[in-house]
Each structure stands twice: as C-alpha cells, then as structure tokens.
Amino acid sequence: MNSSLPLRSPFKVSSLRKVITVITFACLTIGGMLAAERPPNIVFFFADDQTTSTLGCYGHPFVQTPHIDALAARGTRFSQAMVSHSICWVSRTTILSGLTGRSYGTPGQRDLARAEAVEELYPDLLRKVGYRTGFFGKWHAKMPKGFQAKDHFDVYRPVGRNPFYKKQPDGTLRHETDLIVDHAIAFLGEQAADQPFAINLWFNACHAEDGDRRPGIGQFPWP
C-alpha cells in the first residue's frame, strides 16, 4: 500500500453522503411534483382567413376586437409570419396534421390529403394522454375518401356559414359565431373536473362576406 496517499476524513465522507441524500430527495420531490402537475387546458381559437389588419391589437382604427386585444396584451403577439399555402383548407389540414401542403398532399392534387398523412391528427395525440377534445365550427378540409372527422374528437359539432344567421327552434336568429361558442360552453358544462380538455373553436365569419344584408343585423349592419 502506498502510504503517501491521504486518508479520507470520515467527517468529509459523512457530509458528502448527506449532501447527496439531500440532492436526491430534492430531485425526487421535484420530479414527483412535475409528474403530478395537471396538464394545461387548451382553447384554440382559429379565425379563418383573417388578416392582422382587421384586428384592434394590430392598430386598426375602426374594427373593434376587445377580447382578442386583451388576449394579445397578456400573451404573445407576432409581428411577422409565413404560410406555405395561402389557402384556407390547406392551412387547416397543416394544423391538424403538422405537415405542409406539399408534404401531406396527393401527387397531382396537393390540396387533397393522403390517407396515411391524416391517419393520426394532433387531437388524437392529446386523447392518448388523457385529454377530452372538442371541435366546433368550420371544418372544410380536403380529406381522403372514407375519412371521418368525428372519429378524431370526443365531441364534433361542425357549423357552416351558409347562411350566417341560423333559425332557431323558437324562431329567432342566431349567428354561427355565437353557435360555435354555445357548443363550446355546453362542452365545458359536461367536462369532468379532473380531466384536461382541448377545445377547437374554428370561426368562419371572417372568411367571406355575409350574404344576409337585412338592415340592422350584426355588429356592422347594412344600412
């Protein structure tokens, strides 16, 4: 044995063991807290074909969007963006699949999704980890023959825009934007408190002109 090697101090070894024990306990505690932390709920507002120039938070002097402005003030507002295809249904399929139009499309018809490209959508991934998912609003994505959108959500309620104002059972008219929100509120009313949820509210009114030109209808009515 080499007598020149220093002997380890029992005090130092004991102290080191205590430090390692404390660090290990802290790591296990933090890891357990993170594992037990509830996943965030997701509310996805998608305004179809809406340009930033029609939002108050981007400086429009006339259009009133107070709720969107409030979300922008509390969150992140992007000043630059890029899309691979400036077509409404391509952007929707890109969001659902995570693939660009050139990636998911059928040869010779790039805006039509291939079956294998849309076999599993992002709501399917959320469902696998315990989320309850809902879809309300405009669908209109070019999917392959036999594709069923309702199979990819726990609750699926498409709402179209022709006409924008829908006649209700009591004879009154209700705008499709309000109906989309109504469906989402009903979804939340049936939601279990211990389960995370993901709601997709895909609005359609900003996509095209409202053909209902009766005076006094809507926030910006025809004269």
Go through each PLM region and give its residues.
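Bacterial N-terminal signal peptides that target proteins for export
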Residues: N2-I23
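Formylglycine-dependent sulfatase
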Residues: T24-C27, G31-P223
